[in-house]
Design a protein with these regions (language model features):
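Extended, structured polyanion-binding interfaces
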Residues: 1-908
């Protein structure tokens, strides 16, 4: 077996050979692809076997997933010291999880008595009958695994789950927050059945019968339910805790019988995850184990501020479990942790590792769900895997949101004072003050302000390099070879959202290399992508490419070389199969239940018209040719065969489709005038914060954290993507946000980029050749020294200034000066920038690049009301097209759109 160094050397040699081939591929996306080349490309796209291994914790990876030469995402060279929670797993549960059907018959023959005992089968059962019953247990266990887990959990998990009506693979998707709750009484209320943890206070047979009587468990096997109940009651430390309190109660009942009748029965409580530092002289537990302590108090005084408490009383109320509680995970997922035990908590750390830092929840989860050769029930639990991955991520995000809520001032959220003032003015209350305010900063990944910031950064790329030429949508193919090769026995791709996310990430990186470094569609000047998720959670990426001027797509011939919208001929059967499988849209009267159908019309505007020649029209995507050449492909819908021709083909590129065997839609967008709407589509998100009035209308509350959570949808592939901290957006160039004075805390003397710019102009005559926004292309900003330094590497950064309202005239004119004067030493007025309406034209022209029609009309109204332009009529006529472009786009009628926009402008 080769050593790690030998393996690394072999991989590097392969990469060198591949890079040599890549140099020949510049623009090869414009070639006709042969059958032989299609097969060669598919082999190049193969990620290889998952045979790379972390030397510390033995997690398995594709070689392309390594971070540098030695780092992996699993253990951070220290987390391997965390005890393996699955090391001593009950044998019968392990067999149920692994469902090794192939070896079952032989194993039962050889060890019949053992299997009869493990699965509580009748003593006289023969091997054939035992095999049949156990195989039925396997099927039932995995079909209803979420129900079995919920039935045996000590704590409940609840949230709004999304229901899917149409057929498709399983997807667990939640909307809003997830809650974990524990019954706070040992016995149920009168005439109610015990639930969750209360079931462990009754005997096994009764508990199993109660579980089976629940409507949700009607399809579960009573025998399997009883079997799992007996295992959990025998193994779980939480079940042991319930026995402790039962023993203490029985002991106190006997003592009370012998005591003075006037003495009240003592108060008995059980506390999970109890504080080890409790004063033992004051709070002396009657019994204790590793997760719980039972207290008896004659005066009713028990420890306070404990997370989870169970009282010796009847009731139906629940206590919420904090996400920081170390028992939460084991209480919610008894099938994964049948022995109980502790999970992540804020104080978790590894001695002498990670430079003394505590282990984050994200690191803990990544380590737990990494793929290894050792047994891990999480990765073979199919539907329950979806649930716990979503639960993991929601908990991680909840921790981050809590930090933001508690540290608003430290995070300089006072930068958003203008928003608070606006809310005060709009409140109309006798006490118009902002109440509990939580503003999500732009650093919160996935939040509305994060997406808006990156949309503005993307528009800065457009101002620097021009409009994008190609809009590529790359969708994950769950049937990729790499996914299927690494499925465990009896699994389907939908059962492994972790594999789906990992393979898609690796393929996306490879695709971006082909597009940007190799340039298979042409030489690229700038690029960006955003990762999103389909309704059922399948990941896809929206990619925008800005081509070099020498590779721009300008003629119908250029369109034909890059994009095709026709079914390939039978000469290349492999490509034909790829296109007919991935790139043919199917809807219409023969398939009215297709997701794209609304009011019996396809929202994607299929079928298209037959076109003999490609066209490039201003204002829309280029239209590739769709010849009526007789090529068709068959689809079966609801038992009926329908034939689809070139009118139903989604535009694609032969090279990319051949290599990646996936849905890769390639659209030529260079002719679109209102390109900002393409960027708006790519950077979808919340446009504004939700606002909520208090019940007494006395104060107005702005809680962006709650609004974000309430509006959020999370599926398992997305949750896994975020747990692994993969980028949800990326672009070719960094964008330096350049400050104005308002963004600088008036109480601080620290320099901003603006002050550093002024200092740079004094110290470096070379810098006076550049505008403020051009400085980041030639200088880097040193955060520590608060000054600009000459850039040593190739330019991969551009500058962007925040947009300033004309109402704030001092900042507006400062910004105007910085945008149009190199090395400024005079005011905007002295420069002659304010002598006519030119500053308003500049403002509207800049805003039209990234603001919507609605926002532009509001800006135009502000100019009219606040700035009194000398010629407002001509100013309106000059920008009438952009002021009305949203309504023209919606109505598809120029005159009507302009009328609606003008009416709105009058009411602004």
């Amino acid at each position: 077996m080769e050593s790690l160094d030998e393996t690394m050397s072999r991989i590097e040699d392969i990469q060198i050979k591949r890079n040599a081939k890549k140099k020949k591929l510049l623009g090869s996306g414009k070639q006709e692809i042969s059958e032989e080349m299609t097969k060669e490309l598919q082999e190049q796209a193969y990620l290889g076997a998952m045979d790379a291994e972390c030397p510390t914790c033995h997690a398995k990876y594709f070689w392309c997933e390594r971070k540098g030469k030695t780092r992996w995402a699993c253990c951070e060279h220290g987390l391997d010291q965390i005890p393996n929670p699955f090391a001593e797993f009950p044998e019968v549960l392990k067999l149920l999880f692994e469902q090794n059907v192939k070896e079952l018959e032989e194993n039962v023959k050889n060890e019949l008595d053992k299997y009869i005992s493990l699965f509580n089968l009748a003593p006289q059962t023969d091997s054939a009958s035992a095999t049949k019953q156990i195989r039925a247990f396997f099927t039932d266990f995995h079909t209803n695994i979420r129900k079995y887990n919920s039935a045996h959990s000590f704590a409940s998990m609840s949230g709004k789950t999304v229901k899917f009506n149409n057929k498709g693979g399983y997807c667990y998707k939640i909307h809003g927050q997830i809650y974990h709750n524990l019954p706070d009484s040992a016995r149920p209320a009168t005439q109610q059945d015990p639930t969750y943890g209360q079931l462990f206070f009754v005997d096994t047979s009764e508990a199993s019968a109660i579980r089976m009587s629940h409507k949700a468990n009607s399809k579960c096997s009573p025998l399997l339910m009883t079997l799992i109940t007996s295992v959990i009651e025998k193994e779980s430390v939480f079940s042991e805790s319930c026995k402790m309190i039962k023993e203490v109660i029985a002991d106190q009942v006997e003592k009370h019988k012998r005591a003075d009748p006037s003495v009240e029965f003592p108060k008995i409580t059980m506390h999970f995850d109890s504080n080890k530092s409790l004063d033992k002289r004051r709070y002396n537990p009657a019994q204790t184990n590793e997760v719980a302590a039972v207290f008896v108090s004659a005066d009713g005084q028990v420890p306070v501020n404990l997370d989870m408490t169970v009282h010796d009383k009847k009731g139906s109320s629940y206590r919420s479990i904090k996400f920081t509680n170390k028992c939460r995970l084991a209480m919610t997922y008894s099938l994964y942790f049948p022995k109980g035990g502790s999970g992540w908590h804020p104080g978790l750390h590894v001695e002498h590792q990670l430079n003394g830092k505590k282990i984050t929840q994200c690191q803990f989860v990544r380590h737990m769900i990494a793929i290894r050769d050792s047994f891990n029930p999480i990765l073979i639990s199919n539907k329950l895997l979806h649930q716990i991955i979503v639960d993991f991520y929601v908990s991680i995000e909840q921790e981050r949101l809590l930090f933001l809520q508690l540290n608003q001032k430290k995070l300089k959220a006072e930068k958003y004072d203008v928003m608070k003032e606006h809310l005060d003015q709009q409140g109309g209350n006798t006490n118009p003050s902002v109440g509990r305010t939580c503003i999500l900063p732009s650093s919160f990944v996935g939040g509305p302000r994060y997406m808006t910031e990156h949309y503005q950064d993307a528009m800065a790329l457009v101002r620097e390099f021009g409009k994008p030429d190609l809009f590529v949508t790359f969708t994950c193919n769950p049937n990729w070879r790499e996914i299927k090769e690494n499925l465990l026995p009896n699994q389907r791709p939908e059962d492994r959202p972790d594999l789906v996310a990992r393979v898609f990430k690796a393929k996306l990186n490879m695709l971006m290399d082909d597009l940007t470094k190799v340039g298979v569609l042409g030489k690229v000047s700038a690029w960006l992508y955003v990762v999103e998720y389909q309704k059922r959670g399948l990941p896809h990426a929206h990619i925008l490419l800005i081509l070099d001027e020498s590779h721009k797509i300008k003629t119908p011939a250029d369109v034909d070389r890059v994009v095709s919208a026709e079914i390939p001929s039978s000469d290349n059967k492999t490509l034909r199969n790829i296109i007919t499988k991935n790139m043919v849209h199917c809807c219409g009267p023969d398939h009215p239940t297709a997701p794209c159908m609304e009011d019996d019309v396809c929202t994607k505007k299929f079928p298209k018209e037959f076109v003999e020649k490609s066209t490039v029209k201003t204002g829309t995507f280029a239209s590739p040719r769709r010849r009526n050449n007789g090529e068709k492909t068959a689809r079966t819908v609801n038992g009926k065969t329908i034939w689809l021709d070139n009118r139903w083909v989604v535009p694609y590129n032969q090279f990319l489709s051949s290599k990646y065997d996936a849905h890769i839609n390639v659209e030529i967008c260079s002719s679109i005038t209102a390109i900002k709407y393409v960027f708006k589509y790519v950077y979808k998100g919340h446009d504004r914060a939700h606002m909520k009035l208090g019940d007494d209308d006395s104060e107005q509350k702005l809680d962006e954290a709650k609004a974000y959570v309430d509006a959020r949808y999370v599926s398992a592939p997305e949750a896994y993507w975020r747990i692994n901290e993969y980028e949800i957006q990326k672009r070719s160039h960094g964008v330096q946000k350049l400050h104005d004075d308002e963004l600088q805390d008036k109480t601080e003397k620290a320099s901003s980029t603006l002050m550093a710019f002024f200092q740079l102009n004094q110290d470096d005559p070379e810098a006076r050749k550049y505008y403020y926004t051009k400085i980041p292309e030639h200088y880097t900003y040193n955060q520590k020294d608060k000054k600009f330094q000459a850039r040593k590497n190739v330019r991969m950064s551009i500058g962007r200034m925040y947009f300033v309202s004309m109402k704030n005239q001092e900042l507006f004119y400062l910004r105007l000066l910085l945008l149009h004067v190199k090395g400024p030493t005079e005011s905007a007025k002295e420069r002659g920038l304010l002598q006519d309406d030119n500053e308003f034209r500049l403002t509207l022209a800049e805003a039209s690049q990234f603001q919507t029609g609605f926002q532009l009309r509001c800006l135009f109204a502000t100019i009219l009301a606040q700035c009194q332009p000398s010629d407002p009529k001509n100013l309106y006529l000059e920008f009438a097209d952009v002021l009305s472009e949203d309504w023209v786009k919606k109505t598809n009628d120029l005159a009507r759109g302009e009328r609606i926009a003008y009416a709105h402008l009058k009411n602004c």
